[in-house]
Curated annotation (Swiss-Prot):
Keywords: Coiled coil, Cytoplasm. The keyword Signal does not apply. This is Suppressor of IKBKE 1. GO terms for cellular component: cytosol; FAR/SIN/STRIPAK complex. Residues 70-102, 162-193 form a coiled coil. It holds the Pfam family SIKE. Interacts with IKBKE and TBK1 via its coiled coil region. Interaction with TBK1 is disrupted upon viral infection or TLR3 stimulation. Interacts with CDC42BPB. Interacts with SIKE1 which mediates association with the STRIPAK core complex composed of PP2A catalytic and scaffolding subunits, the striatins (PP2A regulatory subunits), the striatin-associated proteins MOB4, STRIP1 and STRIP2, PDCD10 and members of the STE20 kinases, such as STK24 and STK26. It comes from Homo sapiens. One of its GO terms (molecular function) is protein-macromolecule adaptor activity. Changing residue 43 to E: No effect on interaction with SLMAP. Changing residue 94 to D: Loss of (SIKE1:SLMAP)STRIPAK complex formation. The keyword Transmembrane helix does not apply. It is found in: Cytoplasm.
Amino acid sequence: MSCTIEKILTDAKTLLERLREHDAAAESLVDQSAALHRRVAAMREAGTALPDQYQEDASDMKDMSKYKPHILLSQENTQIRDLQQENRELWISLEEHQDALELIMSKYRKQMLQLMVAKKAVDAEPVLKAHQSHSAEIESQIDRICEMGEVMRKAVQVDDDQFCKIQEKLAQLELENKELRELLSISSESLQARKENSMDTASQAIK
């Protein structure tokens, strides 16, 4: 009987050590997730500032588009795509952390069940309390990760909407630039025709 109890206690200690390792891994994942959340918030602020920046620089872009329209449009499109790509990478990383936490929680429940079965002959109340405490904490952490994932989805949706609006503005600027060039070409041709008519009239007057 003493051998059986000693074996049960040894198994319990081993399981508790594994639980501590899982807790440490979960805390590390939560820290990484918090860092991702801060980056997401920074990205959202940057995304919100984009429309104001484009409104302030709209007139400057219109003037500059007369000289270097293709270069400017290419630069703006590259910056927007880089922001969207970074947002998507953050979102994927966040989902990977969420999956890892859920896997840890599943293993944690399995080990706690094994511990409870092995300790039927021993008072299980402290183990139950520890299980309830750790389970509630890890589930709370998973809820936080889910909330962060939802924030990321909304941020990516906002970025996509802003990208479409900016694309429309850039297309409008290209059209205006083309029309201005056509007007300039027509004005130049008209001026040249008037100059030639004036020269012909002067030549006839001299004769």
